[in-house]
Amino acid sequence: MGKRWQAERKRDHYYRSAKKENYRSRASYKLLQLNNKYKLIKKGDRVLDLGAAPGGWSQVALDKVGEEGLVVAVDLQRIKGFPAENFRAIRGDFTDPEVKDKIIRELGGRADVVISDAAPSLSGIRDIDHLRSVDLVENVLDIAYRVLDRKGNILIKAFQGPELDRVIKELRKDFWKLKTTKPASSRKASAEMYIVGRDFKGKEKWERIIH
């Protein structure tokens, strides 16, 4: 990263707040803001966090679920653990069938909430990055539909564009409440937005839009 990016990050309010309040990343505030608004995670929930490194969202989720709940975090990178017995970290590719099976074992079957702040490797070319983002969203949905309990919730990062609109159109059929939003802590220049799905109807499989 360049010196200009580093300087801008240090001036960023949420970056400084994360350091002060001991959050692992500024992204923690996105989940805090969205959960405060939509009440996605509650005490006792089983939460699956996909693309979780460095653990900013898992950190917030652990606080919300309390000792009665469970957070399972998955990423290709190592996720440093938390001093909590109800946290499980899995290092691996969540599209891998063996990793999916391990996720289900750690969850004990089902999840109440599936969250993902994952982003694809970016090329700088908007159309390509949009397609990569939608592919990642669909990979998240592949496992979310497999593990999400009826009445469960999802929160997934995505980049705006026409292919995402097609995905959202299908999601509206499978959740009683579905919308897209952008929290205050998202950078203004970012094309990111978040899919908020509440009250899952219980469909067993996601049918991919992009093949």
Curated annotation (Swiss-Prot):
Q: What class of enzyme is it?
A: transferase
Supply the source organism for this entry.
Methanothermobacter thermautotrophicus (strain ATCC 29096 / DSM 1053 / JCM 10044 / NBRC 100330 / Delta H) (Methanobacterium thermoautotrophicum)
Q: This protein is called what?
A: Ribosomal RNA large subunit methyltransferase E
Sorted keywords for this record are:
Cytoplasm, Methyltransferase, rRNA processing, S-adenosyl-L-methionine, Transferase
List, in alphabetical order, the Gene Ontology terms for molecular function in this entry.
rRNA (uridine-2'-O-)-methyltransferase activity
Task: Look up keyword Lyase and say if it applies.
Answer: no
**Cysteines joined through disulfide linkages:** none
As recorded in UniProt, its EC number(s) are 2.1.1.166
Give the highest taxon in the source lineage: Archaea
**Chief site of localization:** cytoplasm
| InterPro entries (alphabetical) | RNA_methyltr_RlmE, RNA_MeTrfase_FtsJ_dom, rRNA-MeTfrase_E, rRNA_MeTrfase_gammaproteobac, SAM-dependent_MTases_sf
Instruction: State the family it belongs to.
Output: Belongs to the class I-like SAM-binding methyltransferase superfamily. RNA methyltransferase RlmE family.
As for subcellular location, the record says:
Cytoplasm
Record function comment: Specifically methylates the uridine in position 2552 of 23S rRNA at the 2'-O position of the ribose in the fully assembled 50S ribosomal subunit.
The record places the active site at 157
A GO cellular component annotation here is: cytoplasm
Query: Is Cytoplasm among the key words of this record?
Result: yes
The record's annotation in Pfam families points to:
FtsJ
Q: Which reaction does it catalyse?
A: uridine(2552) in 23S rRNA + S-adenosyl-L-methionine = 2'-O-methyluridine(2552) in 23S rRNA + S-adenosyl-L-homocysteine + H(+)
